[in-house]
Every structure is written in structure tokens, then in C-alpha cells.
């Protein structure tokens, strides 16, 4: 799934537009591999497995001594990470944007919402639904962060800054899917049962970010991923405004603001890792870039379309909600913010990773040009989320 980041699908899901090292790098001290099941097991269709095969999975690739890096950063995290959380009493809640069911004017408010939604085209709804489903798979994302060695919430109520951040971040994110879900439900424009099935399939399938229980890789992944969601929700806000639904624009804009705040926090973690362990951190950035940042919803399935995520991504690309150019811009922003080009004292492997990362954005922009050329010949496919209507990719 090359360059598939919540809206970009420049190749099939079979992998990368960029070279990918076939062997593990020398930096890996201890790692185990979860192999594919045997032919006998693999040939049997299982009810609760991803719609397609995930990669051979590497686990616990971070050398054990590196855990000390994250132990030593606990005070830093308490002072520099937790400040990017908002107190619950100061956070917006979904009810702030929705018709009040306890109000005498509830029915009229719902009618007004539905009238506004009549002006919104079906392809926009496809993208908004895809974004909502991605947000609703939040249990998977908290699970992913809690796979990371050295920072996981060991008990479910651990009081380290890392664990506090993960729980509170999850609590803030939980409002996003709730709000979009309720808005779409009230709109009357979508097939909620198909959407709900897609959410259940997605959470059941999990995700395959290839972060290897390694917090270096995990925080690089989340930094870039949060940049993507900020851009995506920001663009859905812009389009909602163009379609005349100012309330929906406000909803998407408020979610985008949260995502930007979270992006800043995760970006600061990688920035700090580059300060205390520049070689280890730049190798992690290079590793994730070579693998390609797969989006959390890349195993999306509705019971019908085996390529649902690719189709949703293609619509998002066509509408300008999230494109390869956006990915290049996000990557360029982070590489500049992290001052990767200025790193010195790196190992030979670190310098190769540095060169690769710094030269990646221009290569992605060339791929964007090819994608635009292919888009002129795009087909149309049905989306169960909008009652099987066909949408151009």
C-alpha cells in the first residue's frame, strides 16, 4: 500500500514506491519474528482476521538498554509532553455541536441539519465517513502505543508521564469519532449499518504499522500520522464551508485543531530523541520512511469491498482532502523541524539514513504528478456506506 496515508493510494497495497532494505539493520540487537501461519492454517478462512495478509511481523527490535533512554526522559515528558493536554472541563464535547435532544427545538434542529446536508455531494460523504471510521478505531491505536517497550501503560493505570499521556490522549481523541458518528447518523444521507459493520471489522482486524514494539519507530509514526489527520480534517472543514454547511466546517476544524496539538506533542518527542540519541533516532526515521507510513485504517473492510481503503483513499486524493503533495509537505515540515540535515557525528548507517530522509520529499512530489495523470482515467466503484452509489475514484 504505497503512500497510503488516509487519502493517498499511488500503488497497490503490495508495497512501496521506495527501496526497502530486505535485511534488518545492524542496530537491531534482539528481535523476534512472527511468521505467517502454516499452509494448513492459512488456507482456512478465519472470521476475525484482516481482509488481507499483513507483513511478516518483527517484534521487540529495540536493544534492551535503550529502555533507559525513555526512563531518563520521564521528567522531561512530565514537563514538556503533558502540557499539550487540555483539562477535561476546558475541552469541547460532541454535544456542543449537535442538536440538543433535551431541547423542545430538537426536531427543528435536526431538520435544519438535514437541510444543510442535502447540499453536500456523495463523494464528500465518502471521505467524511472514511475519516470517521478511522477515528472510531481508537481502541486499536491505544493498543498500538501500549505495545511500545519502555513507555507502555503496564497496569492500565500506571502513573508514569508516558502512560498518563497515552490515556489522556486517547480520551481526547475519543470525542472525534463520537462527534462525526452522531452527525452522520443525524444527516440521513448514509447507511449507518454498513458504517457500523466497517468499524467493527476494522477494530477486529487491528493494524500493521511495523513499529516493532520500538518507541523510536512508534513516535516517528505517530508524529507523521498526526500531521496527516490535521491536514485531512482541515480540508474536510474547508470543503464543508464551500458546500454551505458552516456547522460541519466548525466540527471538522475543531477536530483538526486537536490533531495539530497532538502532532506538536509527538513531534517534540522525536525532537528530544534526536537530541539525546541522534544516531538511533535518525535510523528510526529512515526505517519508517523506507517501510512507508501505513495508515491505521489500511485494513478497512465492509464485508464487500476487499480494496475499500484504497478506494476511499483515491476519492480523498481526487477531492484534495489528502494527497501525495500533502504527504511531501508534512515530511518536509518534520525533517526541517527536527533539523535532520544538520545532524553531525552520525555513524555511516546514520548518514545514509539522513541522506535518504532529506531527499525523500522531492521524490514523493514526482509520484504525485504520476498519480494526477492516472486519475484522469479513474473508474467508478460503489460504496456501501452511501447505499451502493457509484463514486469516481
Swiss-Prot record:
**What Pfam families does this protein's entry cite?**
FA_desaturase_2
Task: Quote the Gene3D superfamilies the UniProt record gives.
Answer: Ribonucleotide Reductase, subunit A
Write out the GO MF terms: metal ion binding; stearoyl-[ACP] desaturase activity
GO annotation terms (biological process): fatty acid biosynthetic process; fatty acid metabolic process
Q: What class does this enzyme belong to in the EC scheme?
A: oxidoreductase
User: Which residues are Fe cation 1-binding?
Assistant: 135, 173, 176, 259
What are the boundaries of the transit peptide?
1-30
Which residues are listed for Fe cation 2 binding in this entry? 173, 259, 262
Annotated cofactor note: Binds 2 Fe(2+) ions per subunit.
Pathway(s): Lipid metabolism; fatty acid metabolism
Q: Which CDD domains match?
A: Acyl_ACP_Desat (cd01050)
Fetch the PROSITE patterns from UniProt: FATTY_ACID_DESATUR_2
Entry-linked InterPro entries: FADS-2_CS, Fatty_acid_desaturase-2, Ferritin-like_SF, RNR-like
Q: Where in the cell is it found?
A: Plastid, Chloroplast; Plastid
Keywords (A to Z) from UniProt: Chloroplast, Fatty acid biosynthesis, Fatty acid metabolism, Iron, Lipid biosynthesis, Lipid metabolism, Metal-binding, Oxidoreductase, Plastid, Transit peptide
- Reaction(s) catalyzed by this protein? octadecanoyl-[ACP] + 2 reduced [2Fe-2S]-[ferredoxin] + O2 + 2 H(+) = (9Z)-octadecenoyl-[ACP] + 2 oxidized [2Fe-2S]-[ferredoxin] + 2 H2O
Q: Which cofactor does it need?
A: Fe(2+)
Q: List GO terms (cellular component aspect).
A: chloroplast
Query: What EC number(s) does this enzyme carry?
Result: 1.14.19.2
**Family classification:** Belongs to the fatty acid desaturase type 2 family.
The protein's role, per its UniProt record: Converts stearoyl-ACP to oleoyl-ACP by introduction of a cis double bond between carbons 9 and 10 of the acyl chain.
How is the subunit organization of this protein annotated in UniProt? Homodimer.
What is the name listed in the Swiss-Prot or TrEMBL entry for this protein?
Stearoyl-[acyl-carrier-protein] 9-desaturase, chloroplastic
- Organism source for this protein? Solanum tuberosum (Potato)
Amino acid at each position: 500500500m504505497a503512500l497510503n496515508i488516509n487519502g493517498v493510494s499511488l500503488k497497490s497495497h503490495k508495497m512501496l514506491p521506495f527501496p526497502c532494505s530486505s535485511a534488518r539493520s545492524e542496530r537491531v540487537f534482539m528481535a523476534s519474528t512472527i511468521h505467517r501461519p502454516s499452509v494448513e492454517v492459512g488456507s482456512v478462512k478465519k472470521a476475525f482476521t484482516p481482509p488481507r495478509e499483513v507483513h511478516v511481523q518483527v517484534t521487540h527490535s529495540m536493544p534492551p538498554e535503550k529502555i533507559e533512554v525513555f526512563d531518563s526522559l520521564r521528567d522531561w515528558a512530565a514537563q514538556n509532553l503533558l502540557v499539550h493536554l487540555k483539562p477535561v472541563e476546558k475541552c469541547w464535547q460532541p454535544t456542543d455541536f449537535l442538536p440538543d435532544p433535551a431541547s423542545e427545538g430538537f426536531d427543528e434542529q435536526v431538520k435544519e441539519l438535514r437541510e444543510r446536508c442535502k447540499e453536500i455531494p456523495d463523494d464528500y460523504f465518502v471521505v467524511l465517513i472514511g475519516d470517521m471510521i478511522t477515528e472510531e478505531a481508537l481502541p486499536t491505536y491505544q493498543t498500538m502505543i501500549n505495545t511500545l517497550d519502555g513507555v507502555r501503560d503496564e497496569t492500565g493505570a500506571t502513573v508514569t508521564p508516558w502512560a498518563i499521556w497515552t490515556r489522556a490522549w486517547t480520551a481526547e481523541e475519543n470525542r472525534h469519532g463520537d462527534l462525526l458518528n452522531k452527525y452522520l447518523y443525524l444527516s440521513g444521507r448514509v447507511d449507518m449499518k454498513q458504517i457500523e459493520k466497517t468499524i467493527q471489522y476494522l477494530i477486529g482486524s487491528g493494524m500493521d504499522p511495523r513499529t516493532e514494539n520500538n518507541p523510536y519507530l512508534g513516535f516517528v509514526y505517530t508524529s507523521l500520522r498526526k500531521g496527516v489527520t490535521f491536514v485531512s480534517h482541515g480540508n474536510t472543514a474547508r470543503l464543508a464551508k464551500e458546500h454551505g454547511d458552516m456547522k460541519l466546517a466548525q466540527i471538522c476544524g475543531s477536530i483538526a485543531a486537536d490533531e495539530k496539538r497532538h502532532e506538536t506533542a509527538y513531534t517534540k518527542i522525536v525532537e528530544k530523541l534526536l537530541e539525546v540519541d541522534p544516531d538511533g533516532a535518525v535510523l528510526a526515521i529512515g526505517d519508517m520512511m523506507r517501510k512507508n507510513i501505513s495508515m491505521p485504517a489500511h485494513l478497512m473492510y465492509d464485508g464487500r469491498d476487499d480494496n475499500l481503503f484504497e478506494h476511499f483513499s483515491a476519492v480523498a486524493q481526487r477531492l484534495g482532502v489528502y494527497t501525495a503533495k500533502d504527504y511531501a509537505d508534512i515530511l518536509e515540515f518534520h525533517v526541517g523541524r527536527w533539523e535532520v540535515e544538520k545532524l553531525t557525528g552520525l555513524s555511516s548507517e546514520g548518514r545514509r539514513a539522513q541522506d535518504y530522509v532529506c531527499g525523500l520529499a522531492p521524490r514523493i512530489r514526482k509520484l504525485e504528478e504520476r498519480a494526477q495523470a492516472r486519475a484522469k482515467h479513474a473508474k467508478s466503484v460503489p460504496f456501501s456506506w452511501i447505499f451502493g452509489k457509484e463514486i469516481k475514484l
